[in-house]
Amino acid sequence: MTNEDVGTNSVADRLQLGPREGVTYPIQMKYCGHCTMPIEYCEYYPEYEKCKEWLELHMPDDFERLKIEEEAAAADGTDDDKKRQKRGGKGLLRVKKKEDVPKRICVSRAARGKKKSVTVVTGLSTFDIDLKVAAKFFGTKFACGSSVTGDDEIVIQGDVKDDLFDVIPEKWAEIDEDVIEDLGDQKRT
């Protein structure tokens, strides 16, 4: 058998190197603003209806072309709902919504032993501040031990409560001095 018998002409056409006829280079891709994928792949996204709304507002000419293609596919009966995932698998990752908790920072002093005390800072996580970074900052700023002890609690060794009213707004500009609340002396639990 020779190569001509197998049909190498069609294989050679498919494996042609270089630019193809009828294609303009460089290729410009259009991306959806909702799902951030190329608009050809929006139909495979679980929230396809929202992608269509975005396309209608921002790319009306592409939306019209998409609508014509959908109508043609519906007329052929090739749609068959096979594109959307109905059950199983991971599906779409849901973004957790931020709870609307009041943004305030509470600073208190608690006794530790006979003559020693600790300063407890709570509420920094409502401002999306990394507590580990904040604890490290307080430890270096006040030359003392500082650690994250709870979900939203930093314990600083020593009585530095008065200094925190100046240090926190200075370090994090998004925190105003008015949202820092002094709870006074507390009993540690």
From Swiss-Prot:
Please describe what happens when the gene is knocked out: Animals die as pharate adults with crooked legs, abnormal genitalia and a larval-like epidermis. Proliferation of histoblast cells is impaired.
Q: Which PROSITE patterns match?
A: SUI1
Secretion signal, residue range per the UniProt entry: none
User: Which superkingdom, per the lineage?
Assistant: Eukaryota
Single GO MF descriptor: mRNA 5'-UTR binding
Provide the GO biological process annotations.
Answer: formation of translation preinitiation complex; positive regulation of ecdysone receptor signaling pathway; positive regulation of insulin receptor signaling pathway; regulation of translation; translation reinitiation
Q: Which GO terms describe its cellular component?
A: protein-containing complex
Q: Pfam families from the entry?
A: DENR_N, SUI1
InterPro entries, sorted: DENR/SUI1_TIF, DENR_C, DENR_eukaryotes, DENR_N, SUI1, SUI1_dom_sf
Q: Which PANTHER family does the annotation name? A: DENSITY-REGULATED PROTEIN, DENSITY-REGULATED PROTEIN HOMOLOG
> What role is this protein assigned?
Regulates translation as part of a complex with MCTS1. Specifically required for translational re-initiation in mRNAs containing upstream open reading frames (uORFs). Not required for standard translational initiation. Regulates expression of a subset of gene products including mbc, InR and EcR.
Q: What is this protein called?
A: Density-regulated protein homolog
Species this chain originates from: Drosophila melanogaster
